[in-house]
Amino acid sequence: MADKKKRKRSKDDEAEELPFKSILESDDVITELLKSYISSSIKAAAGAGGASSSSSKPLTLADLSLSSSCREVADLSLSSVQTEIETVIVQIARSILAGDGFSFSVPSRAASNQLYVPELDRIVLKDKSTLRPFASVSSVRKTTITTRILALIHQLCLRNIHVTKRDLFYTDVKLFQDQTQSDAVLDDVSCMLGCTRSSLNVIAAEKGVVVGRLIFSDNGDMIDCTKMGMGGKAIPPNIDRVGDMQSDAMFILLVEKDAAYMRLAEDRFYNRFPCIIVTAKGQPDVATRLFLRKMKMELKLPVLALVDSDPYGLKILSVYGCGSKNMSYDSANLTTPDIKWLGIRPSDLDKYKIPEQCRLPMTEQDIKTGKDMLEEDFVKKNPGWVEELNLMVKTKQKAEIQALSSFGFQYLSEVYLPLKLQQQDWL
């Protein structure tokens, strides 16, 4: 009898110690609320689509009469990439033979050449090019690197093999000097040829991972992401290997940090609330961005984002949703529409009574980044984002997802996220 009283008392104490746990509904109630939200969202989307809802194709630059002023790339076959490279080289050879010198016409990826298109809700690249001549001290080295990259990709096309960006760098370390230089030219070449980077058969090393209610085929092998342990399944760097996605999830949870991902994976959060959990462990990589978009488009699931409450967390969210300026030429393939900002939001710091010792003062650079983001069109489009960013800049406070651990290591999965889902508290 004493043991029963002790157990009851310990449960009561736990409820008192965990802020807001007492107002949580049961998992079944929260699940039903989510089902209702998803159902109404689908109906609303169908209604808003009107006559165009019968077509599954998203808006394109051509639909907005922007295809002549903006540049976008497409997936090309290896033979097409090979042909494009050979065409470029033939043009250069003719120019040299005519005595006009040797130069590449390279699309400008400068920040001033980026354009946010509200109708598409993503950043695109304006169609403006610059010359990269060989007979110029300022550009001779970059022109040489461009030529070398083109030759290497041509070899990949002939052999029909994939290499990593690191492999590419090590083919000529003395010339490239630093991988950031070969990576940048690789993006230039992709843009020049009018193809996605994956069309070049150059991939990044595996970085992102996924766990939860998802089954898909990886190069013909069926993968069940509920049986991959805490570490989850590494996201294949070649999206062409991925197919036949199946899921009974209600949403996709996009997590910024590996630590938060591991907490949710170990607690098997996806079994309490059917979901798919994915992370790129920080900055979004191309493979994770492609994989997230594929899940969103094929499974038709809402995407909820869990990021740090700082300008960089929101920046990461915006890269997934609106694209990066560095790869705006491929934003059609790399962006995931309508990602909801679940947390951690600046207003959550007071709402969830995050202790002062778990909050961090923003640096001058943090504040500048926050103010710069307030000037971005994709932020201005969302009043909720503007309000949260203004609050962050005003209070000069930031916090990581791990700040929730001050209430207990499992507070994230036991209270914070369930309550967010219960209240449908996202922007």
UniProtKB/Swiss-Prot annotation:
| GO function term, MF aspect, one | DNA binding
From which residue to which does any coiled coil extend? none
| Location of the Topo IIA-type catalytic domain | 76-209
Q: Which domain of life is it from?
A: Eukaryota
What this protein needs as a cofactor is:
Mg(2+)
- Indicate where this protein resides in the cell: Nucleus
Identify this protein by name: DNA topoisomerase 6 subunit A
Q: Which gene encodes it?
A: TOP6A
